[in-house]
Amino acid sequence: SSAEIWIYKPAPEKATGQAIVFCPGGGYSQLSIANGHNTCKWFAENGIVGVMLKYRLPNGHSEVPLNDLDKAVATVREMAGELGVDPHKVGVAGTSAGGYLAGSAGVMSESKPDFMVLIYPVVSSDPDKRHLGTFQQLVGKENVETEAAKFSLEKVVDSTACPALIFHSDDDKVVPAINAALLYEKLKANGVKASLHIFPSGGHGWGMSKKFKYHENFKAATLDWLKVINAEADKAAAKK
């Protein structure tokens, strides 16, 4: 199988110049495709080019999903003209294991995205904090104890990471909220711009569900932060 992308374009009069490549969750064993499409449609409704990425699952080959995401980001930058996108305004986003993938690009990729939005992301491989299934799929069950630490995002963050917006729910029983807090703490220790929202409830996997109590808060906080990032990109471009 190969990776695929679907592109949702905003109405030209609404376009912000930003694009976001979205990585659906699924514990690296499957993909919540529907939530990915819904999220990308919502981005487009708000002036952002939404790019839904159906990435290949790792099956123990840890480089596979990240290669797909890196290629998708590069493709969007190459197509910037026809998409009405500024190539310096291409971000990534994802939920759960997809949040881990987006975070991996923002922290580890050589050619990083310009920003990342991580929604209840898997971050840490520490035994008391991790979502075990994600790391088993990433490095192979037999390699988790020896290999997973080098893929623990909070352990590999440095000052080259891109700005981050992170969401989690305090009562998440699948991926503990401490994952989000650990990454935020390490981003700040490295001088990286980051914003963290931990909602009181909601559990895991709320995505774009209107049943999520903080759905409107989540949407507003995301758009507010993207506006800030957009203004900063414009300011940086004006200085050049």
PLM segments and residue spans:
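N-terminal cap/lid segment of alpha/beta-hydrolase-fold proteins
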Residues: 1-14
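Short beta-strand/loop motif that positions the catalytic acidic residue
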Residues: 160, 166-168, 172
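Short beta-strand element of the alpha/beta-hydrolase
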Residues: 16-25
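Active-site glycine-rich loops that stabilize anionic/oxyanionic intermediates
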Residues: 24-29, 170
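Catalytic nucleophile-loop/oxyanion-hole region of alpha/beta-hydrolase
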Residues: 31-33, 38, 52-87, 209-217
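Primarily recognizes the serine-hydrolase "nucleophile elbow" in alpha/beta-hydrolase
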Residues: 71-134, 148-149, 153
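Conserved alpha/beta-hydrolase "acid-adjacent" motif
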Residues: 173-182
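C-terminal catalytic histidine-bearing segment of alpha/beta-hydrolase fold enzymes
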Residues: 181-240
